[in-house]
Amino acid sequence: GNEIPECGNKLDVQMGKKIADKIRSLDDTRYVTNSVNFVLSIQDRMGEIMAGMAAENTQEVQKKEEASGAEQQEINSMMTDFAAFMDRIVAGETAGKATEEAFGQVDIAGYNYAACRYESDREKYPDRIIVGSETTPQSLDMNWPLVEKYSNVIGDFSWTAWDYLGEAGIGKITYGEKKGMEFYAPYPYKAA
C-alpha cells in the first residue's frame, strides 16, 4: 500500500496482515511493501503531539500563514512550510510505535518523508529493510548519502508533485471563493 492512514490502527493492521499473507500465497517470489507517511499514521493523535512541540515553532508557522493571508495552502507549499515540523513528528516515538506492527508484516518498509528515521530505526529494527518511497526533491542531496551509508536502506524515490495517475484528488481545479487546498476531493476526482 501507499499512505494508508489506518496502518497505525490495531484493527486495520490485522487486515494488512491478511492482505500481505494473501499476496504471498499468490506469489512468494515478490516483495511485499507498505509505504507509510508517518504523519498520516498518527493523525488522530496530532493535536496531542503538536501541543507538546515548542510554542515558538507553532507561532512561527501561524505568523507565516497570517502574513500570506492564506486560509489553506496548496499541498506543495504546505509540505515545504511544515518540513521542519514533519521531521520532528516523524522522528518521534509515537510515530515509531504506531507503525511498528504494520512494518513487521512486510518485506520492505517504505518511508515517505522519513529519512530522519533511517539511523535510529537501523539501530532499533536491525532486520528492517527500508526504502525512501517518497521524498522531496530538495532532500535528494541529503538522502542519497544515507542510502550509501546504511546497507538496510536500499534506495530513495523522489515525489515530484507532477500530475500523474494514481493520486486521488490532485487533478481538481477550483475557481471563485473555494480556492485553496481541497486535495482530498470526492468522486469524480479520484484520479489525476
Segment roles from a protein language model:
Residues 1-192:
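Extended substrate-binding grooves/exosites of carbohydrate-active enzymes
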